[in-house]
């Protein structure tokens, strides 16, 4: 990801390249965006949903008011958190203001240590095992049974996913491992989903094994916290 490259020239080139493609196709992308927005509006009207976010909140089994409170709290914290952080980051880069392509730049003092797949595996298994040995056994099973696909390949979707199938079949983990500390944390995150899905499949039926996003992310973020 050149937008996270340590060299500013590479980050700038990547940002300008993305911007150029978007600019060259602005009418197409505008048409797509407007079409999707109108389709969403029509569906919401048919279903008598009060807000654009209501459909998503309904699927996540959470009230609009709860999400609104969360969003407002985050926005209220901008000055003392994100604004302060980016001001500090600009100073660390000896700049008055950060450019767009500096947002995801690694910090000057950030460790460049990389991890092998085996090292990442051992770190994650140990982290979960120290919390609970039974969960550690399940995590190890994901590696031993090859339920994880980790290489970066042409045509493979970016990002990371825990893909459940049916309750009688184990889930699969899809990551793009490149050896960074963030990749180890991502592996731990997705395995949190994986353990959750594995245990749900063992103890629930096909119709109630799935969970809303609000609950699912609790397990995955907890896995990250165990690891780092």
Where are the regions a protein language model picked out?
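Cation-handling catalytic/transport regions enriched in His/Asp/Glu
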Residues: 1-228
């Amino acid at each position: 990801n050149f937008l996270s490259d340590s060299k500013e020239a590479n980050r700038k080139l990547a940002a300008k390249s993305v911007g150029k493609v978007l600019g060259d196709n602005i009418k197409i992308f505008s048409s797509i965006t407007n079409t999707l927005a109108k389709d969403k509006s029509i569906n919401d009207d048919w279903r008598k949903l009060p807000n654009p976010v209501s459909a998503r909140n309904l699927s996540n089994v959470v009230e609009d008011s709860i999400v609104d409170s969360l969003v407002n709290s985050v926005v209220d914290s901008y000055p003392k958190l994100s604004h302060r952080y980016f001001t500090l980051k600009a100073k660390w880069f000896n700049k008055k203001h950060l450019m767009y392509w500096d947002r995801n730049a690694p910090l000057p003092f950030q460790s460049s240590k990389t991890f092998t797949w085996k090292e990442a595996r051992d770190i994650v298994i140990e982290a979960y095992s120290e919390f609970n040995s039974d969960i550690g056994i399940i995590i190890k099973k994901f590696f031993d049974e090859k339920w994880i696909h980790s290489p970066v390949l042409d045509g493979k979707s970016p990002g990371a996913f825990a893909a459940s199938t049916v309750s009688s079949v184990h889930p699969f983990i899809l990551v793009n491992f490149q050896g960074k500390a963030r990749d180890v944390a991502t592996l731990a995150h997705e395995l949190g989903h994986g353990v959750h899905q594995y245990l749900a499949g063992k103890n629930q039926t096909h119709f109630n094994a799935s969970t809303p996003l609000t609950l699912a992310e609790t397990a995955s973020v907890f896995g990250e916290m165990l690891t780092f």
